[in-house]
């Protein structure tokens, strides 16, 4: 593949091509990482509205981890994420944990999904399953229906029949990395972690309750220091997050507050739109 002069491409496209807003289907067609001018990866936009230039693929297997759902082609990320997952796999193995199963990271160029995710668009998000232990190659290729549900949805608490200390240890190891800004889990999992963390609670503030997330947890890394076009989230609130905010997730909705407003999809970052309109796009499209 010839070296692509990204800046020249973007300027040319901005001046001479139609400014067509990309659809999720457009990003689905990106089958290879989009190369950068200088070889450095660039996350563009935000976690829920962006793309990535120079993504890398996480190898299917490494020390302490295995990539699953490979048929979806969502195992690409920023180099920081790839290195983070490799480090976490090594730490998990050193702690005596079963093989860590890595789910979706991002598509080769990032961008919006047709199904499954609102975020995971810049290669700085990754799902790690709560099922642990190596899968066969066939199951790793297509892992649908093979997850482990650790939350009793009716009781809104962790299912003690399947939850064990390995889950808590892996989440704690995942949160202790300084590049991690948030880890999303089901509110019931956060409650369990708050109850069992003991005196070492310095990592709990990163564990954020969110809808779903009852068979996996979702790691989010901070924007790299040199990423000029990457937008960080606001910092998490102070404290361990084990107080009223957490337990508010279990309260019934107040009358008159359940009316949902229609969601307005914002336009994608200009650079992401122009990448898909690039004269060189055949090099990374199917």
Curated annotation (Swiss-Prot):
Its EC number is 3.4.24.-. Keywords: Hydrolase, Metal-binding, Metalloprotease, Periplasm, Protease, Signal, Zinc. GO terms for cellular component: outer membrane-bounded periplasmic space. Its cofactor is Zn(2+). Zn(2+) 1 binds at residues 117, 120, 127, 218. Binds 2 Zn(2+) ions per subunit. Zn(2+) 2 binds at residue 152. The keyword Transmembrane does not apply. Its main location: periplasm. One of its GO terms (molecular function) is serine-type endopeptidase activity. One of its GO terms (biological process) is proteolysis. Residues 1-22 form the signal peptide. It is found in: Periplasm. It is an enzyme of class 3 (hydrolase). It comes from the Bacteria. Pfam families: Peptidase_M74. Murein endopeptidase that cleaves the D-alanyl-meso-2,6-diamino-pimelyl amide bond that connects peptidoglycan strands. Likely plays a role in the removal of murein from the sacculus. This is Penicillin-insensitive murein endopeptidase. It comes from Haemophilus influenzae (strain ATCC 51907 / DSM 11121 / KW20 / Rd).
């Amino acid at each position: 593949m010839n070296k692509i002069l990204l800046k020249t491409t973007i300027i040319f496209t901005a001046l001479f091509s139609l400014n067509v807003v990309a659809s999720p289907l457009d990003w689905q067609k990106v089958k290879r990482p989009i190369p950068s001018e200088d070889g450095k990866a660039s996350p563009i936009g935000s976690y829920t509205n962006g793309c990535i230039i120079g993504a890398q693929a996480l190898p299917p297997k490494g020390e302490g981890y295995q990539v699953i759902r490979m048929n979806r082609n969502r195992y690409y990320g920023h180099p920081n994420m790839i290195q983070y997952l490799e480090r976490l796999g090594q730490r998990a193995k050193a702690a005596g944990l079963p093989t860590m199963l890595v789910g979706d990271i991002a598509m080769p160029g990032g961008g919006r999904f047709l199904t499954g995710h609102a975020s995971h668009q810049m290669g700085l998000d990754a799902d790690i399953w709560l099922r642990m232990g190596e899968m066969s190659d066939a199951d790793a290729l297509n892992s649908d229906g093979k997850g482990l549900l650790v939350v009793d949805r009716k009781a809104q608490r962790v299912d003690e029949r399947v939850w064990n200390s390995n889950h808590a240890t892996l989440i704690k190891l995942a949160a202790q990395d300084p590049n991690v800004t948030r880890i999303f889990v089901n509110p019931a999992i956060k409650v369990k972690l708050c109850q069992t963390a003991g005196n070492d609670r310095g990592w709990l503030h990163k564990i954020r309750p969110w809808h779903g997330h009852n068979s996996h947890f979702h790691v989010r890394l901070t924007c790299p220091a040199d990423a000029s076009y990457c937008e960080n989230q606001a910092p998490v609130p102070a404290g361990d997050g084990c107080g009223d905010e957490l337990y508010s997730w279990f309260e019934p909705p107040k009358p008159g507050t359940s009316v949902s407003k229609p969601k307005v999809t914002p336009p994608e970052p200009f650079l992401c739109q122009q990448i898909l309109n690039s004269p060189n796009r055949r090099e990374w499209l199917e």
